[in-house]
């Protein structure tokens, strides 16, 4: 049972790291979140994005 718990925790940690690296900052300069929507649609297939530190972040 201990091994199962350890494997489960390891799987969760790996899944979190993979998911957080899947999307993120893209090389598009912006001043408003609406400028990121089209760029994020092209990269991720979703318009969910925002302008963060003058760079688009897609979700």
Curated annotation (Swiss-Prot):
Tissue: Expressed by the venom gland.
GO CC entries: extracellular region
InterPro entries: Scorpion_toxin-like_sf, Scorpion_toxinS_K_inh
The keyword Disulfide bond is annotated on this UniProt entry: yes
Disulfide bonds: 30-51, 36-56, 40-58
GO molecular function: ion channel inhibitor activity; potassium channel regulator activity; toxin activity
Keyword Transferase: no
UniProt KW keywords: Calcium-activated potassium channel impairing toxin, Disulfide bond, Ion channel impairing toxin, Neurotoxin, Potassium channel impairing toxin, Secreted, Signal, Toxin
Localization, UniProt: Secreted
Site for Aromatic residue of the functional dyad, residues: 59
UniProt superkingdom: Eukaryota
Range of residues in the leader sequence: 1-22
Any Pfam family: Toxin_2
Site (Basic residue of the functional dyad): 50
Function: Blocks calcium-activated potassium channels.
Family: Belongs to the short scorpion toxin superfamily. Potassium channel inhibitor family. Alpha-KTx 16 subfamily.
Record remark on domains: Has the structural arrangement of an alpha-helix connected to antiparallel beta-sheets by disulfide bonds (CS-alpha/beta).
Protein's name according to its UniProt entry: Potassium channel toxin alpha-KTx 16.3
Lineage: Eukaryota, Metazoa, Ecdysozoa, Arthropoda, Chelicerata
């Amino acid at each position: 049972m201990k091994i199962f718990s350890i494997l489960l925790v390891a799987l969760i940690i790996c899944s979190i790291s993979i998911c957080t690296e899947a999307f993120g900052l893209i090389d598009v300069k912006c001043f408003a979140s609406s400028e990121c929507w089209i760029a994020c649609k092209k990269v991720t297939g979703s318009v969910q994005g925002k302008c963060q530190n003058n760079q688009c972040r897609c979700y």
